């Protein structure tokens, strides 16, 4: 008898699905270091007013914790619709919005509805690492088309890939993670027009970093492509609500009807809904940090370029830079300097989040000591 019941067996001993054997789970290191720049969070903490509002809002719902929450999160979705209408300039209503526990749950629900066994999803790589993981988890066949040498998306090449593969789901990340480039509305139209040539097929435009982007939101295209386009977003990045775990999508009302078929009952807790609504009431204050982060991004980009690094131009709150002979070894050197950044698996490149000015200074000081490749 060991101290941990059941520790005599391993994952290999379980009747796991064959298609999951050999897979690796998602994981960004969570280490205690002086400077953490690896998960693209907004480094500015919530204001005292926001903290007080969240605390009061949670206190108000605490008396009803013995009851299930609003299973459709109507009040939260209404607030999100109002925020999106103001932020993007495209009027949307509660009927256009769906919310869940982070945008990853949104993506999972979309793959449950539109992917699954016998269906496929196409991604343009390198891009967000959870897209293939969620595809695998929903038994959706994962297909890839490569981005260019600068990691940008060539719309003509991407449209050709859509026509060739006729996927059931297409992922387009804008701004792209980990490279940072946005996709223009004209290029998105080209991809959507290619998708319209086939029966079925849905394009998911992942706008997790949309508040940082210089390009208009794809939400403005939903009216023209109601059966083809879904836009996903999150409160974890610019909104500085990563600990709150709220993501959402914007689409034609019929897509929300599809989500109702696959969501788990009462999936968003009363506490989550109350806290998120409080955060939305302070959107102007929170998003005031976006301009500061963009200015810091440009400062860090210029400094790294001046040191001799190759910096991929970014439209988000992070920078992909290189070119290193051994990216994993260089990542360790940064960690030894007390700076945690991200090895995203692209040979020769590392990604850093834009942090507070003093955190960025620490990154630049470490970069100067490490030296450009």
UniProtKB/Swiss-Prot annotation:
Designated gene of the protein: hisC
N6-(pyridoxal phosphate)lysine modified-residue sites: 237
Molecular function terms, GO-annotated: histidinol-phosphate transaminase activity; pyridoxal phosphate binding
Biased composition range(s): Polar residues: 1-10
PROSITE patterns the UniProt entry points to: AA_TRANSFER_CLASS_2
Disulfide linkage: none
High-level lineage: Bacteria, Bacillati, Actinomycetota, Actinomycetes, Mycobacteriales
Protein's name in the database: Histidinol-phosphate aminotransferase
Family indicated by similarity: Belongs to the class-II pyridoxal-phosphate-dependent aminotransferase family. Histidinol-phosphate aminotransferase subfamily.
